Amino acid sequence: GIRMQGQEVFRFAVSSSAKDLQAAAEEAGMQVAQADWVLLHQANMRIIQSVRQRLGVDPARMPTNIHRLGNTSSASVPMLLYDLYHSGLLQPGHTLALSAFGAGMTSGACLIRWDKPVPHELRDHAETLFFA
């Protein structure tokens, strides 16, 4: 039968997310912990917290929505970005570090600088975000 190697997947997720984020940050001339926001694939809280601890990221800079939505697969980072945008916490000039992993043991990360202002009427659900 088919079996998932849970510990192997956990180790891959934590190590690849951390390495990918560090490589992207290094290319940008910064450390991951300097990003205003770090958005990870919302697989489970244990992975998210392990990556956060490994990189020394302030929990207040790593929002999560897995408590509300569960693991939404490849949509988790875009949905988390949507929630952050609509919370009113994301502001022009902020740097975001994004990381995801998934099928076939693939992973990737990038850094972006946000420049879109948040209209006041969209600032409606900051309370839906928790922090790792």
Walk through the language-model features, giving the residues of each:
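Short active-site-adjacent structural elements
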Residues: 47-49, 74, 105-107
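Hydrophobic pocket-lining "lid/loop/helix" segments that shape and contact the acyl-thioester
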Residues: 1-67, 118-132
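Active-site-adjacent helical/loop segments in soluble small-molecule enzymes
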Residues: 65-77
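Conserved beta-strand-centric core segments of catalytic alpha/beta enzyme folds
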Residues: 81-132
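Buried hydrophobic packing segments
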Residues: 20-21, 51, 77-84
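Generic structural "secondary-structure junction" signal
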Residues: 4-6, 11-12, 68-71, 92, ...
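Hydrophobic alpha-helical segments
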Residues: 54, 58, 69, 83-87, ...
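A short linear-motif detector with a strong N-terminal bias
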Residues: 16-19, 75-78, 89-92
